[in-house]
């Protein structure tokens, strides 16, 4: 749309002074030759990369640097969107670009374009700042939008490679094959090619068509209309897409820039100016002045126009003044705040939606409506009641949703037309479409206070007295207010000034006769005005040549008189429009320039003709030719105003966007932003509609006000932006909060207390919806102050809302401070319902304070008031609150009775979303009571009913509560793995719809565990899928520990699924993630758990050594985690024993035994020495094994405390007996050990073990070893450890 690129940059507004004569050079002027190779290369097909990188960074305005936490949050959000990029694609589709990929690590998007229109629109949105604002919509959540200070301080800055963007633009331009260029220099074709090649002047505009690659192109001059070949080296494509679009869609001729014209950096001016040189007029309508004379500027003087309207301060005469004859530094330039339009014109743009102001205000009051003064609140219910679902009645008509349409209508070029008196059919059709289909002259009864009653009977044309009234009426010298209706394009003069004609032809005949009498009577002004009226009526009948004659006659009659400037302007502009329609530019080139000056230089002038757009287009073409941004801006504004008045909204957008780029400074840009938001809303572009109002809001922070109709527009469009389900009754997006705050500030300036209060209530509703009661309390406190100023009812309602917000913020004491005085202020004669409402809220506050008895009394009083007025709903709420109070007080039986009664009362009510959501909460409480009373079937039924009601209304939060309860029921109360998985899956779906990424990650983790517990091939595969999805989310959320554990879980699952090649990969990723987080305890834990994967498995168990010995042990030593190190050495010992690596096992067991003596835990020491004894035994080091076993026995308590200790004694002494007898060949010591084992077995009461030991003793006594050594003589062996040695 009407935009420019950062690159190509706008060149100097003067592209070379003056119109140059053709060069004597037979080809081109010398200044073009140097760059001919480059220019030819630009027009040749090139293999360019069609993708563009869009980078962004989040910056703090106050600190002027990157906001690190927000930048990281935005990057993580982008990472989450990489695999689910539908939302991003839709955003860039609105921004007229195509998403190729997302590069979250670099905070970049890769986009591409297929047409020049796409790159034009995108570059426009980029330069208007809409791309960065739309990225805010995408990347920031409600927490950001609710933080007003953060929003005001934060901006997203986007950047692209401007040169690459220009390259893509030129490539697409050439690909389309038809575009417009500017002549870089004067060109005269050689004699042999005369007639075949074009003769060009410098800066001349040419329409070019690409046929095939070569040094010459076919072109048509927009100045002469001639067709021919032109050298590529002499041309430069117009760098601005808006200019290409405009020249293609509004075809027509244009002039050349003149040598003595000044444009440059000059602004539109007004006031007085000084003549550089004197001027002798060539026409009667031009002003005569001398050098140095002071000239008063009537309206504006605009750089790029040949003329402006001036008044001589010496003679008082008014006429056209050639712009080049005045000193551009002598006039007063327009301020930056109104660079191209007057204050009245700016207000006309701002008033675009003002007719909807009352309706929009009504909508805000409806949105703010609450039933808190008549409806009881349920304990735990999270928001102030919302207004009714059907808001269509209060929805302003002009802001209904519309289906997406085209950005603008494509206009087809009109073919060449004959300039004869009879117009061709295509011209007639075009003009007929611009005029009304039929017209009925009104009867006298239709009119209010007509100016004239005209009547012309047959045969009265010759009687002068019959025309005296109209001639006297029209022959006023200069302008009068009653002539205003003559010049508007609605032909209102037919109803406001004349009547009594039933047919238009009859009226035309009367005017024609009047013209003749005016001419005879030399009544100049009446004659001119009658010609003007006849010309306008001829245009209505598409008789352009006839109209042209009338207008030319009127101008001739005026003879340069400017007393009625409105008449002069309307005559010139209408005649110029006809010249352009009939292709008669050669006949009226001077008049075209003067008509353009009257059109552009006179502010606040009402449009007089629908085909005035042709003159506006001519002025805009001239602005493009001379490179005058002020003239281009002024022409764009005129096009906007005219098209809006004609209701052709689709055609306005390109001009409005271009004008916004050219304006740049408020309040002019503010006025155009207002138009843009209106148009984007019409075209169903919600991102852009909100972004344009945000732009307005930024300016509003600098002192501008935000209209209420734009707030309504934002409220409508923000609900379309977010991917949540369609918002229910009264829900407002947090994205609207900044604009609501701006509107609130504007209402404070206007002292509009009623709307202020409505906005405060809406803002509080948003904060409560997002569980930010502190923000709600802030705005409700304001609403209370405003309510007290507005009236008792508003004050009462605001007080209740504030008390409810305090309750939701768990500030029961403050709620009591509001409610108790409110109750005292109510008279006994006041509404019973209002007293009941206060008692109910008092009950909630007292319950929050833990004052159960007083809370119960308040609830009962509220119940009594509801019963007195017969309000079943309020009775149900009071019963439910009593039940909840009883439940919290562990009074199960009363709780059950109250809640059952509440359910019965709710069932009597007519079903609605509000009551059903309350019933969900009651069912959950009742289920809790029933389950705690072991009525599991009935409790389950209540849980399922709660879920059913939530599903019925598609209410996510109630479904979430019910689903949580069902998951707990099937996991802990009545375990059922399959049902538990089913409800966890539904819980996951709800989390995804709510976009709660943290909840989604936790649920995927839980689901992975549940599927893993089923231990089937299919469940393991599903578990792996869940773990991988949770991993992606944890990385997105920056939860390093969770991400590392997810990697570990994935490795564990790959091991169970025997996908060994992926196990090490996942385990290493888990450890690296932990190490990068610089959390050594997490890394230590993961090293150990990674080793456990192999240690607890059946395959590749030796891989555990690497994770234990090389990873966990060094970290444990560095962290001085002695117990962890001991546990790992114990695992290493056990692992090596199972692998029969006894030498290694001895090393690890020895280290474990040493560490165990440091811990001070005898049990750990006992385990370590027992393992060491086992290793020595396996290595056939029996004496050391005996010593270690004896050491373990010395660590046991002296008195047996349990059968387990007795069993341990029996087994160890039995092992020592066998070891001593069989390996050490000491029968006497073996006997002692067996006797001790027998004693332990007797204490244990194990008859079988006793028999085995007695059998062993008998065998020893009968063995040769028993007799080979004297009785009582034991062999001498090492007893270092068991003898009290302190070190191994």
From Swiss-Prot:
Designated gene of the protein: SH3TC2
Q: Which disease is it linked to?
A: Charcot-Marie-Tooth disease, demyelinating, type 4C: A recessive demyelinating form of Charcot-Marie-Tooth disease, a disorder of the peripheral nervous system, characterized by progressive weakness and atrophy, initially of the peroneal muscles and later of the distal muscles of the arms. Charcot-Marie-Tooth disease is classified in two main groups on the basis of electrophysiologic properties and histopathology: primary peripheral demyelinating neuropathies (designated CMT1 when they are dominantly inherited) and primary peripheral axonal neuropathies (CMT2).
Record Pfam families: SH3_1
| Stored PROSITE patterns | SH3
Q: Which PANTHER family match?
A: SH3 DOMAIN AND TETRATRICOPEPTIDE REPEAT-CONTAINING PROTEIN 2, SH3 DOMAIN AND TETRATRICOPEPTIDE REPEATS CONTAINING PROTEIN
Q: Name one GO biological process term.
A: peripheral nervous system myelin maintenance
Outline the TPR repeats, range by range. 528-561, 757-790, 836-869, 1001-1037, 1084-1118, 1119-1152, 1166-1199, 1210-1244
Keyword match Repeat: yes
Which GO cellular component does the record give, naming just one? plasma membrane
Question: Where does the record place Polar residues bias?
Answer: 386-395
Q: Which UniProt keywords apply?
A: Charcot-Marie-Tooth disease, Disease variant, Neurodegeneration, Neuropathy, Repeat, SH3 domain, TPR repeat
Q: What is this protein called?
A: SH3 domain and tetratricopeptide repeat-containing protein 2
* Protein's organism: Homo sapiens (Human)
Disordered, as annotated region: 386-405, 410-444
Protein origin, superkingdom: Eukaryota
Q: Which residues form the SH3 domain?
A: 176-240, 268-331
Instruction: Report where it is expressed, by tissue.
Output: Strongly expressed in brain and spinal cord. Expressed at equal level in spinal cord and sciatic nerve. Weakly expressed in striated muscle.
Which InterPro entries did the record assign? SH3-like_dom_sf (IPR036028), SH3_domain (IPR001452), SH3TC1/SH3TC2 (IPR042772), TPR-like_helical_dom_sf (IPR011990), TPR_rpt (IPR019734)
């Amino acid at each position: 749309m009407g935009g420019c690129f950062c690159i190509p940059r706008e060149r100097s507004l003067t592209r070379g002074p003056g119109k140059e004569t053709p060069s004597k050079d037979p080809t081109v002027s010398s200044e073009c030759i140097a760059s001919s190779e480059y220019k030819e290369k630009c027009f040749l097909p090139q293999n360019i990369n069609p993708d563009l990188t869009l980078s962004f960074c989040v910056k703090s305005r106050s600190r002027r640097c990157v906001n690190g936490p927000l930048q990281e949050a935005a990057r993580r959000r982008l990472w989450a969107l990489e695999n689910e990029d539908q939302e991003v694609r839709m955003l860039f589709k609105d921004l007229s670009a195509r998403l190729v990929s997302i590069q979250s690590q670099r905070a970049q998007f890769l986009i591409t374009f297929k047409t020049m229109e796409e790159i034009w629109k995108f570059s426009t949105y980029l330069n208007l700042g809409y791309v960065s604002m739309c990225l805010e919509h995408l990347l920031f959540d409600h927490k950001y939008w609710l933080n007003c200070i953060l929003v005001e301080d934060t901006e997203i800055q986007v950047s692209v490679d401007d040169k690459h963007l220009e390259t893509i633009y030129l490539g697409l331009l050439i690909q389309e094959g038809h575009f417009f260029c500017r002549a870089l220099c004067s060109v005269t074709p050689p004699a042999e090619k005369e007639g075949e090649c074009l003769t060009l002047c410098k800066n001349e505009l040419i329409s070019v068509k690409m046929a095939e690659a070569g040094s010459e192109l076919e072109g048509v001059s927009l100045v002469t209309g001639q067709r021919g070949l032109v050298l590529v080296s002499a041309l430069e494509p117009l760098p601005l897409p808006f200019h290409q679009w405009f020249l293609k869609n509004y075809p027509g001729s244009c002039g050349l820039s003149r040598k003595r014209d000044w444009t440059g950096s000059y602004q539109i001016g007004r006031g007085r100016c000084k003549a550089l040189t004197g001027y002798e007029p060539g026409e009667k309508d031009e002003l005569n002045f001398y050098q140095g004379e002071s000239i008063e500027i009537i309206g504006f003087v605009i750089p790029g126009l040949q003329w402006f309207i001036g008044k001589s301060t010496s003679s008082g005469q008014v006429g056209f003044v050639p712009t080049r004859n005045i000193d551009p530094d002598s006039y007063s330039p327009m301020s930056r705040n109104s660079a191209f339009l007057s204050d009245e014109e700016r207000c006309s743009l701002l008033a675009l939606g003002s007719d909807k102001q009352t309706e929009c205000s009504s909508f805000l009051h409806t949105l703010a409506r609450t039933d808190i003064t008549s409806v009881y609140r349920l304990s735990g219910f999270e928001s102030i009641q919302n207004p009714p679902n059907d808001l269509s009645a209060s929805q302003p008509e002009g802001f209904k949703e519309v289906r997406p349409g085209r950005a603008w209508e494509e206009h087809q070029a009109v073919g060449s037309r004959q300039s004869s008196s009879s117009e061709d059919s295509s011209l007639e059709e075009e003009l007929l479409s611009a005029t009304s289909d039929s017209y009925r002259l009104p009867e006298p009864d239709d009119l209010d206070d007509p100016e004239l009653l005209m009547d012309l009977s047959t045969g009265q044309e010759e009687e002068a007295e019959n025309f005296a009234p109209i001639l006297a009426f029209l022959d006023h010298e200069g302008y009068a207010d009653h002539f205003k209706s003559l010049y508007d394009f609605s032909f209102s003069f037919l109803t406001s000034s004349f009547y009594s004609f039933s047919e238009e032809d009859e009226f035309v005949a009367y005017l024609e006769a009047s013209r003749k009498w005016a001419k005879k009577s030399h009544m100049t002004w009446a004659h001119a005005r009658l010609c003007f009226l006849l010309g306008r009526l001829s245009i209505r009948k598409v008789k352009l040549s006839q109209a042209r004659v009338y207008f030319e006659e009127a101008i001739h009659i005026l003879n340069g008189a400017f007393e009625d400037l409105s008449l002069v302007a309307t005559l010139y502009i209408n005649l110029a429009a006809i010249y352009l329609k009939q292709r008669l530019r050669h006949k009226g080139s001077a008049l075209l320039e003067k008509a353009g000056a009257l059109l552009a230089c006179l502010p606040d002038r009402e449009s007089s003709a629908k085909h005035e757009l042709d003159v506006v287009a001519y002025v805009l073409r001239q602005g493009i030719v001379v490179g005058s941004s002020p003239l281009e801006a002024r022409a764009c504004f005129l096009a906007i105003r005219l098209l809006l008045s004609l209701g052709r909204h689709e055609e306005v957008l390109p001009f409005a966007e271009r004008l916004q780029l050219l304006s740049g400074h408020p309040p002019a840009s503010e006025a155009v932003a207002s138009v843009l938001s209106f148009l984007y809303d019409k075209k169903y572009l919600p991102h852009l509609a909100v972004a344009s109002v945000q732009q307005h809001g930024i300016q509003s922070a600098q002192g501008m006000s935000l209209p209420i109709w734009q707030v309504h527009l934002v409220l409508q469009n923000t609900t379309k932006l977010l991917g949540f389900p369609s918002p229910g009754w009264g829900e407002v997006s947090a994205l609207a909060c900044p604009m609501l705050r701006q509107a609130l500030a504007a209402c404070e300036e206007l002292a509009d207390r009623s709307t202020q209060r409505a906005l405060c209530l809406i803002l509080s509703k948003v904060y409560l919806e997002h569980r930010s009661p502190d923000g709600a309390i802030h705005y409700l406190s304001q609403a209370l102050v405003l309510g007290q100023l507005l009236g008792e009812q508003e004050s009462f309602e605001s007080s209740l809302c504030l008390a409810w917000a305090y309750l939701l913020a768990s500030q029961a004491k403050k709620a009591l401070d509001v409610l108790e005085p409110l109750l005292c202020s109510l008279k006994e004669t006041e509404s019973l319902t209002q007293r009941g409402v206060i008692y109910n809220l008092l009950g909630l506050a007292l319950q929050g304070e833990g004052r159960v008895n007083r809370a119960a009394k308040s609830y009962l009083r509220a119940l009594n008031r509801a019963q007195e007025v017969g309000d079943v709903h309020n009775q149900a709420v009071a019963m439910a609150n009593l039940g909840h109070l009883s439940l919290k007080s562990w009074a199960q039986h009363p709780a059950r009775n109250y809640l059952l009664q509440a359910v019965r009362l709710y069932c009597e009510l007519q079903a609605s979303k509000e009551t059903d959501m309350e019933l969900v909460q009651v069912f959950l409480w009742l289920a809790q009571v029933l389950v705690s009373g072991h009525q599991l079937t009935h409790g389950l039924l209540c849980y399922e009913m709660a879920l059913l009601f939530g599903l019925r209304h598609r209410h996510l939060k109630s479904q979430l509560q019910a689903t949580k309860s069902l998951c707990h029921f099937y996991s802990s109360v009545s375990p059922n793995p399959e049902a538990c998985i089913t409800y966890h899956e539904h819980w996951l779906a709800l989390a995804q719809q709510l976009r709660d990424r943290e909840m989604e990650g936790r649920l995927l983790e839980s689901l992975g565990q549940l599927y893993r517990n089923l231990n089937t091939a299919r469940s393991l595969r599903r578990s792996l899928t869940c773990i991988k999805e949770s991993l992606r989310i944890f990385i997105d959320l920056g939860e390093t520990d969770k991400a590392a554990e997810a990697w570990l879980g994935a490795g564990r699952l790959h091991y169970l699924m025997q996908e060994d090649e992926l196990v090490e990969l996942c385990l290493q990723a888990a450890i690296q993630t932990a190490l990068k987080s610089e959390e050594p305890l997490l890394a230590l834990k993961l090293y150990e758990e990674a080793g456990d994967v192999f240690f607890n498995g059946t395959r590749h168990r030796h891989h555990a050594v690497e994770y234990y010995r090389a990873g966990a042990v060094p970290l444990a030593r560095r962290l001085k985690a002695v117990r962890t190190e001991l546990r790992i050495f114990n695992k290493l010992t056990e692992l090596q024993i199972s692998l029969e690596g006894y030498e290694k096992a001895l090393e690890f067991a020895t280290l474990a035994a040493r560490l165990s003596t440091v811990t001070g835990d005898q049990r750990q020491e006992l385990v370590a020495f027992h393992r060491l004894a086992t290793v020595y035994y396996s290595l056939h080091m029996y004496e050391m094994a005996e010593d270690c076993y004896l050491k373990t026995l010395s660590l046991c308590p002296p008195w047996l405390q349990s059968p387990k200790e007795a069993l341990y004694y029996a087994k160890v002494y039995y092992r020592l007996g066998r070891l001593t007898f069989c390996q050490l060949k000491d029968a006497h010591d073996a006997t002692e050990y067996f006797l001790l084992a027998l004693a332990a077995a007797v204490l244990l009461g194990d008859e079988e073990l006793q028999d085995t030991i007695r059998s062993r003793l008998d065998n020893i006594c009968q063995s040769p070893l028993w007799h080979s050594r004297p009785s009582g003589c034991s062999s001498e062996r090492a007893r270092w450890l068991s003898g009290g040695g302190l070190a191994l």
